[in-house]
């Protein structure tokens, strides 16, 4: 089943010049970029995005970190996109993520962990409108569809 997922490349990914390498990994897997934005997340956007963590002790630090520099927001589309991106991203704690995953290769910790990916269709439905209007999602085809 084709589905969509929201992916954020966090400030550490941008500062470390990993944008192209990470997007290449996602596209190489067969995921299609249908929306892409380089932006500075506002405090309101961050608090909304991480609202499920509002009562947790790390919430304030999370908001401060994600707003500390520019991010890349994107919507990816493909079969089982949510599950596929979560597998490619690796464990939330980069020090425990498997080599070959994005976090396993580029992250050493849990706070600065390079990438965010929606963890469910419900999360995508909450997160996507924080960063994109429906009109910014581009419906397009490769022409000759690539089969993976």
UniProtKB/Swiss-Prot annotation:
Enzyme class per UniProt: transferase
Cellular component annotations (GO), alphabetically ordered: cytoplasm
Catalytic reactions of this protein: a 2'-deoxyribonucleoside 5'-diphosphate + ATP = a 2'-deoxyribonucleoside 5'-triphosphate + ADP; a ribonucleoside 5'-diphosphate + ATP = a ribonucleoside 5'-triphosphate + ADP
Reported cofactor(s): Mg(2+)
A single BP term in Gene Ontology: GTP biosynthetic process
Record's keyword terms, sorted: ATP-binding, Cytoplasm, Kinase, Magnesium, Metal-binding, Nucleotide metabolism, Nucleotide-binding, Phosphoprotein, Transferase
SMART domains in alphabetical order: NDK
Keyword Transferase: yes
GO molecular function annotations of the record: ATP binding; metal ion binding; nucleoside diphosphate kinase activity
Gene3D superfamilies assigned: Nucleoside diphosphate kinase-like domain
Subcellular location: Cytoplasm
EC number: 2.7.4.6
Residues at the catalytic site: 116 (pros-phosphohistidine intermediate)
Stored SUPFAM superfamilies: Nucleoside diphosphate kinase, NDK
Binding site for ATP: 10, 58, 86, 92, 103, 113
Purpose of the protein: Major role in the synthesis of nucleoside triphosphates other than ATP. The ATP gamma phosphate is transferred to the NDP beta phosphate via a ping-pong mechanism, using a phosphorylated active-site intermediate.
NCBIfam families assigned: PRK00668.1
Family: Belongs to the NDK family.
Protein name stated in the entry: Nucleoside diphosphate kinase
Annotated source species: Thermoplasma acidophilum (strain ATCC 25905 / DSM 1728 / JCM 9062 / NBRC 15155 / AMRC-C165)
């Amino acid at each position: 089943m084709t589905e969509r997922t929201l992916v954020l490349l966090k400030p550490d990914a941008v500062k470390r010049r990993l944008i192209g390498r990470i997007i290449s990994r996602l596209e190489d897997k067969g995921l299609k970029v249908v929306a892409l934005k380089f932006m500075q997340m506002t405090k309101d956007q961050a608090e909304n995005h991480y609202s499920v963590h509002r009562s947790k002790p790390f919430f304030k630090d999370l908001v401060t970190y994600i707003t500390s520099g520019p991010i890349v927001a994107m919507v990816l589309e493909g079969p089982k996109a949510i599950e596929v991106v979560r597998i490619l991203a690796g464990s939330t704690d980069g020090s425990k993520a498997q080599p070959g995953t994005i976090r396993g290769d580029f992250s050493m910790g849990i706070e600065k962990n390079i990438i965010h990916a929606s963890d469910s269709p419900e999360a995508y439905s909450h997160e996507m409108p924080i960063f994109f209007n429906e009109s910014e999602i581009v419906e397009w085809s490769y022409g000759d569809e690539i089969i993976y």
